[in-house]
């Protein structure tokens, strides 16, 4: 309980920084779990610290800000004007918009960001999206709608990203696994930009 009070106090003082730290940490935990539970290579058995760092960077510097903004938009802009804002029909609307707009676009964005941070080409990002987008989206739809219905109904706005991030430890484990799965399967070479002297 004390930890929650510290989190709330920090969220009031520095909301963006707090969300960035929390989201990055939980993305990192997801990647650590993925590497320990689902090692992707029988040849390279070492732990990939850079991969975890990429997950933390994505969570902290990219997703935390997008997620925070997205939940504010869902809360403040997405509702039927003729119903009370917290009516069950508005919760259904928010879940539908979240799952039919944000999720289908967020997954390719994730795979693209990770490819770029891995130093790989856009062709690799396209390959990841081609092979992983639909199965990952189907899994997303099996996991997130029920949770988001609860999240939008019960959890206060300022804690929604935290609630998502806690549940997302498992989701991030899965995403990290899916992201690395394409790379192992295809052994796509890393393309670094040419050095200009």
From Swiss-Prot:
Compartments where found:
Mitochondrion inner membrane
Q: In what way does this protein cross or attach to the membrane?
A: Multi-pass membrane protein
Mind telling me which GO cellular component terms the entry cites? Answer: cytoplasm; mitochondrial inner membrane; mitochondrion
Major location, coarse class?
Answer: mitochondrion
Keywords attached to this entry: Membrane, Mitochondrion, Mitochondrion inner membrane, Transmembrane, Transmembrane helix
An example of a Pfam family matching this protein is: Mpv17_PMP22
Q: Which BP terms from GO are recorded?
A: ethanol metabolic process
Where are the membrane-spanning stretches? 20-40, 55-75, 97-117, 137-157
Is NAD given among the entry's keywords?
no
Top-level taxon of the source organism: Eukaryota
Q: Does the keyword Transmembrane helix apply?
A: yes
InterPro entries for the chain: Mpv17_PMP22 (IPR007248)
Impact upon substituting residue 54 to Q = Almost abolishes function
Q: Briefly state the protein's biological role.
A: May be involved in cellular response to stress. Required to maintain mitochondrial DNA (mtDNA) integrity and stability. Required for ethanol metabolism and tolerance during heat shock.
PANTHER family in alphabetical order? PEROXISOMAL MEMBRANE PROTEIN 2, PXMP2 MPV17, PROTEIN MPV17
Give the UniProt family note.
Belongs to the peroxisomal membrane protein PXMP2/4 family.
Q: What else is known?
A: Present with 1870 molecules/cell in log phase SD medium.
Q: What is this protein called?
A: Protein SYM1
Mind giving the lineage of the organism this protein is from?
Eukaryota, Fungi, Dikarya, Ascomycota, Saccharomycotina
What is the gene name? SYM1
């Amino acid at each position: 309980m004390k930890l929650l009070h510290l989190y709330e106090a920090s969220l009031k003082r520095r909301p963006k920084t707090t969300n960035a730290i929390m989201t990055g940490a939980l993305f990192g935990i997801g990647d650590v779990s993925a590497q320990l539970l689902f090692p992707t290579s029988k040849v390279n058995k070492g732990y990939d610290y850079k991969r975890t760092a990429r997950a933390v960077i994505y969570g902290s510097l990219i997703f935390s800000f997008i997620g925070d903004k997205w939940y504010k938009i869902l809360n403040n802009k997405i509702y039927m004007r003729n119903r009370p804002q917290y009516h069950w029909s508005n919760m259904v609307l928010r879940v539908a918009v979240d799952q039919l707009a944000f999720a289908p676009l967020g997954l390719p964005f994730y795979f693209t960001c990770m490819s770029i941070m891995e130093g790989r080409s856009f062709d690799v990002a396209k390959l990841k999206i081609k092979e992983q987008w639909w199965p990952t989206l189907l899994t997303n739809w099996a996991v997130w709608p029920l949770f988001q219905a609860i999240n939008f109904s019960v959890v206060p706005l300022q804690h929604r990203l935290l609630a998502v991030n806690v549940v997302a430890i498992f989701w991030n484990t899965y995403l990290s696994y899916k992201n690395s799965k394409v790379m192992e399967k295809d052994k796509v070479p890393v393309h670094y930009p040419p050095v200009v002297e």
